[in-house]
């Protein structure tokens, strides 16, 4: 299950610099709009210290972490919803992602131009939000006309549910709010909402790009964004992308840690961002551990054992019999699977077991 996040923002806010930090691919970080014309795509690993600690005990042939696909989407501009700049193409690229990483410029630097001439991340956020909202309204109005006719002609229950969902979204978007602020109670409404694939319904992480001096505590710009994000239930984080790029170029782990300590940081902003993006979509990890490999597998929080078995192979889900489960802490404390069995800590779970983050799983199946 590959997580796909799109990095968006106005030109020259630090998107490509951030992408360079996240991925080994080098996007062209140029000081002019549209330097990212085709979306740059990079596959990055999700940091997970548990895999390394397990590998020290299991001695596998390899370690396979979970991965996340990052797409650097070219700079949006005012009017993108009407095709300004490269608007239609950019908005289409956003639609293909699972979550949005919205980069906002929260630093002063007279050597880096801003398309509107001044630094105002609140205004920048509103520009991008407005373009996405206008595109969503266009989608809704087109769909609403069609579904209203279907609901009226045949007394179609599904069409009526979708009409109610569309009208709820329309009312919110017309107020300049994002679709993600709307909550639906029934499963039917939730399913109808999910199938619309609205841009502003996607989970979003607002990344406040700051200078090195503000890397630890943020600044007045970031605090304004935090207040706005709280109102719509969105996540925020502070990162100094240029500094992170410098850290990424250091050779040794020790040098990187020393640099972070000098800034008063325990973990790199890149690692924090990847973890936040992972949790943004309500994703967790279970682990398989053996002589061949220690591997992280991604699943949706709340999934039961058969569904997680299906992540490895569809046959595992179809022929699921049971799951043998070891808690990560037990494995680390006792040192081996044999010791866990001997201590009576190996769980035998059936089809109703809800898998927990960090569970070490072995599935029994028959096809």
Where are these regions (language model features)?
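Conserved nucleotide-binding/hydrolysis micro-motifs of P-loop NTPases
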Residues: 24-25, 50-51, 75-77, 105-111, ...
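Amphipathic, soluble alpha-helical interaction motifs
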Residues: 57, 100-103, 131, 143, ...
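Switch/coupling subdomain of P-loop NTPase systems
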Residues: 88-89, 95, 99-102, 107-135, ...
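Short amphipathic alpha-helical segments
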Residues: 30-31, 112-116, 218-220, 250
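Flexible beta-alpha connector loops of hexameric P-loop NTPases
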Residues: 76-83, 117-132, 151-157, 213, ...
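Short, flexible surface segments
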Residues: 96, 356-357
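Conserved G1/Walker A P-loop phosphate-binding module
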Residues: 1-113, 122, 141, 147
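C-terminal-of-GTPase-core extension/linker across diverse P-loop GTPases
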Residues: 2-8, 13, 19, 146-354, ...
